[in-house]
Amino acid sequence: RPPRSTLFPYTTLFRSYSAKALATLLLDECVRLYGGSPGDDTTVGVIKIREREQVNLMIGPPSDPKDLNKMMTLFFSKGGKHIVCGGTTSTLTGQFLGKPVIPCLDYISPDIPPMATIEGVDIVTEGVITISKVLDYAKDYLGENKLYDDWTILQDGASCIARMLFEDATDINFYVGRAVNAAHQNPNLPITFNIKMQLVDELSKCLK
C-alpha cells in the first residue's frame, strides 16, 4: 500500500473528475497496458464522496405574465448555480435583475446558438435547440458515452450545461414556464420545437 503522502497529489489532481470519468480513465489505462487486447476481465468501481451542490435551471416564462415575478423570485431564492435558457426568458431575467443581457460572440458553434451573460446568472443560453443537444448528450452518457470528449471540452451552451448537470450538480431543480412561443408552432420546423415539456421530462429522467 503506497504511503498517504504519495496518494495526496492524485486525490487533488482528480478531484474535479466525475466517478464515471475516473472509471473510464482506469479502464482505458488497463486496455493500454494490455496492448489493446485485454487478456482477462477488468472491473472498475468508483465512488465519489462530495458535498452537495444545487443547480437550478429555468426555461421559458410562465403562461400568465402576472406569475413572472413570483417565478423569478422563487428561482433566485434557491442557493447554488443558476442556468437560464431561452431568449425571452433571458430578456425577462435581465429585466428582473436590472442587468443587461450581453451576447457572447467569442465562441461560435455551427450547431448551437450563441450564449449570453447576465450578472448574477451562471449560464445563459438559447432554449429548445440547446436543451435538445443536452438531452442527446445525456442519453449518450448513459449509453456508450461516445460524446464525452465533445461536451467536456467544447464551450457552447449545451456543453456548458451538460458539464454542470452531469458532473457538478448533486441536486437539480427545473423551472419550466408554460408560455407558448409562436415561433415554435411552425409546422415546417422540427418536432422538437413543439415539445419543450417533453424535452425537460426526458432530461430529468436521464439525470435521475
Predicted regions and their residues:
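Short, small-residue-biased leader/transition segments that mark boundaries at the very start
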Residues: R1-P2, T6-L13
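Alpha-helical hydrophobic/aromatic positions enriched in membrane-embedded helices and signal peptides
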Residues: P2, L33, K78-G79
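Short, surface-exposed helix-loop/turn micro-motifs enriched in polar/charged residues
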Residues: R4-S5, S18, G36, C85
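C-terminal catalytic subdomain
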Residues: T11-T73, K99-P103, Y107-Q185, L189-K208
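Active-site beta-strand/loop microenvironment that shapes enzyme catalytic pockets
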Residues: K66, M71-L97
